[in-house]
Amino acid sequence: MLNIFARASVSRFVEPMGVRLVQAGIGPDTITIIGTVGTVVAALWLYPLGYLLAGTIVITVFVLLDVVDGAVARARGSGTPWGTVLDATCDRIADGAVFAGLTWWCFVVAHDRLLAVAALLCLVSAQVISYIKARAEASGVRADGGMVERAERYIITLLGAGLTGLGVPFALDVALWMLAGLQIVTVIQRMLAVRRSVWDREVP
């Protein structure tokens, strides 16, 4: 839901940046890979070591490149099928790494198995949300929307992790359990959207 409004509000700032990067010979695929590698390294290195605030700051910077690579693609005229698949694949890798890093932190640093369950629920449900949309589109039906998409997922997760890194009690607990619940609702919403789309196509 927030993806549409967030991208629209920042497009006027990143579009000129996209033009300059194209002029410098930097393509969207390069930015996508850099953003993914940076996110994965920060999530699987800083979070497991207990550096929640530092990890959150670094991850936020690299996640923002997801907006920039789209601007670069538009500045070049259009995206490519390869770029679309690469971007979607890298998004899934980055999302998985963030929740894997937080799961490790919950187990090893915080010694909180219950919170680790919440992190794992977030990891699995995030992948399922994306898979439903991809599989639906491959089948010629729609599965857009839902309460939580990628933008909301990162805002909730990084806010909770960052505040916990600053010493705010239970911030990550609230964030992960809330996100897990919202993502389960989103899975249901997308499945219902697929069903409605199929019905609409079947009705003469």
Residue ranges with predicted function:
Residues 1-63, 97-204:
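Hydrophobic alpha-helical transmembrane segments
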